[in-house]
Amino acid sequence: MDVQIFPHRLLGADTTEKLLNRLEDIHGVKRMVIHGQRLPPEDHPDRRIINVKGQEFELQVKTGRVLLEVEDEETITDIKRVCEDLLPFGYDVTPGKYIRTEKTVTDEIKYGESLDEIPDELIGLTDQNARLSERATIIKRKKEH
């Protein structure tokens, strides 16, 4: 099951970083995808390295939506609680199907024979128009003991 968080304004780098870290703390969240307008390649205050649970990556978009793959509906309550804390300007949380999980004909055209080499965890996470180096960053959940 997927959930979309749609903030009522674009998020800056600091808010995006805080939101992703808090969402990563929720047990039922399996993976996250951020969407938004691409930041300019030159110096921009929001184009910086952010840290999510010890993993660093360059933020390349002004966050407009956060898509989450979750284990069950109970997780939505925890997601809303995080949004209430960090998004005082308003937001919508909507369950639905947002992240593709199957390879498509478009993927086959784009990637050709190398399609079989793409890990299943990357399916549905990449921007078809982006350069390979900008496609996706996977934030691995730390194993709990």
Swiss-Prot record:
Subunit structure as annotated in this protein's UniProt entry: MCR is composed of three subunits: alpha, beta, and gamma. The function of proteins C and D is not known.
Residues folding into a coiled coil are none
Tell me any Pfam family this protein matches.
MCR_D
Q: What is this protein called?
A: Methyl-coenzyme M reductase I operon protein D
* Taxonomic source organism: Methanothermobacter marburgensis (strain ATCC BAA-927 / DSM 2133 / JCM 14651 / NBRC 100331 / OCM 82 / Marburg)
Q: Which UniProt keywords apply?
A: Methanogenesis
- Primary gene name: mcrD
Mind listing the GO biological process terms from this record?
methanogenesis
Highest taxon of source: Archaea
